[in-house]
Amino acid sequence: MRQFLFYFIPFSVLFSGCRNSGNVKSAEIIVFHAGSLSVPFRQLKDIYEQRNPGVKILLEPAGSLVCARKITELKKACDIMASADYFVINELLMPDYANWSIRFATNEIVIAYGEKAKYSTEINSANWMEILLRADVIYGRSDPDADPCGYRSVLTMMLAESHYKLPDLTGKMTSKNRDYIRPKEVDLVALIESNAIDYMFQYKSVAIQHNLKYIELPEEINLSDPSKADLYKTASLDIRGNKPDETIRVSGEYINYSMTIPFNAVNRERAVDFMCFILSEEGSGIFKTNGQDPIIPF
């Protein structure tokens, strides 16, 4: 049923809304979105507001799981929820708070670092694990219970453990530098720029947007290749669910971002119009410029 809603509702509702967008009135649009979407969404917001005087887009970045819990636990209204993982919308919002999601962009996990990172002249895609585990190296990651990049970082460790045949790599890495776990991946950028940490697990797009150096990881572990779906799903972990005492199991999948218009949207018509702009050729170009390959849904 969810697959049916994924394909039918976005195409019928959004396509109709895009064709009739000229009648949409001025309004305020509240957008809860993944932190890694901050740069492209600010650019989309600026262009849209210039072309639609009187419209104000309010962007609220957070970890995608936190965005979802604003709706499910805090009962906050938003017009668009944009997640770094379709899983968040499908598992935490459907069917009680939304009934469809549409995927619009991809990404990949990299190891990003700053100019003064220790051993930056040595690190590569084959030895990054050994570098990050050195006693004098500090690395950061985001919180798996708050942010998809956080649980994807752990999934990458798990896949690396198998790929490189390094027993207990995940245990060693997750027990190290726990003071440098942050609510969302973009919070780590300031730690890199201030030299508080040497390296971080990060999305490639965020590294590009902030002019950071990064090591690309093999496709077998970076969660970028849909053809490796069977391999990715061999890694899994439990994260917090909708309630503090609940957990949900998340498995490795290739990275894809999705968005929806929740049932509690106040300005649904304008939300459809802005979403159509995000999904347009121009909107897709903005994602491409910012290091993310767009998914063209129609």
Question: Where are these predicted regions, by residue range?
Answer:
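Bacterial N-terminal signal peptides
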Residues: 7-14
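Exported/periplasmic ABC-transporter solute-binding proteins
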Residues: 18-52, 56, 60, 65, ...
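Short active-site-proximal "capping" loops at secondary-structure junctions
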Residues: 62-68, 86-89, 109
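Short beta-strand-centered segments that line the small-molecule binding cleft or hinge
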Residues: 74, 78-85, 89-103
